[in-house]
């Protein structure tokens, strides 16, 4: 579960390395974000020459969480890190590559580009 002040790694090549969650989108009382949810983040560290610069406020979709995610078939999935992919306002990716595995739940949330570029879908 991702909430305000959570730090996430960036799983794409947009130039950012670390994000800080500012807001979970989807309602005024929404506290937690899980896999497939869109959050508003601040870029805390970035590589020089990248598309995204340090201090920028961006939207991102959560692709991996440390907390367990329950699926409809009763199985659970969790990862070793919290990670997100930076997106534009129209749900298009800023980067052109995805690093690390992503979950099948992104397919249900219409993030097909992320699923197709990921090296592994769990």
Swiss-Prot record:
GO biological process: translation
UniProt-listed Pfam families: Ribosomal_L14
InterPro entries the record matches: Ribosomal_uL14, Ribosomal_uL14_bac-type, Ribosomal_uL14_CS, Ribosomal_uL14_sf
KW Cell membrane (keyword) present: no
Example of a GO cellular component annotation carried by this entry: cytosolic large ribosomal subunit
Recorded GO MF terms: large ribosomal subunit rRNA binding; structural constituent of ribosome
Keywords: Ribonucleoprotein, Ribosomal protein, RNA-binding, rRNA-binding
Gene3D superfamilies for the chain: Ribosomal protein L14
Self-association state and partner proteins as the record states: Part of the 50S ribosomal subunit. Forms a cluster with proteins L3 and L19. In the 70S ribosome, L14 and L19 interact and together make contacts with the 16S rRNA in bridges B5 and B8.
Function: Binds to 23S rRNA. Forms part of two intersubunit bridges in the 70S ribosome.
Name this polypeptide is given: Large ribosomal subunit protein uL14
């Amino acid at each position: 579960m991702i909430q305000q002040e959570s730090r996430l790694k960036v799983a794409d090549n947009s130039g950012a390395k670390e994000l800080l969650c500012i807001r979970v989108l989807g309602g005024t009382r929404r506290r937690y974000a899980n896999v497939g949810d869109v959050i508003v983040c601040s870029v805390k560290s970035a590589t020089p020459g990248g598309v995204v610069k340090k201090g920028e406020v961006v939207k991102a979709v959560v692709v991996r969480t440390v907390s367990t995610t329950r699926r409809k078939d009763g199985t659970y999935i969790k990862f070793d890190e919290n990670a997100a992919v930076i997106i534009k306002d129209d749900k298009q990716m800023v980067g052109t590559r995805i690093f690390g595995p992503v979950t099948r739940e992104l397919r249900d949330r219409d993030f097909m580009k992320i699923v197709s570029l990921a090296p592994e879908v769990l």
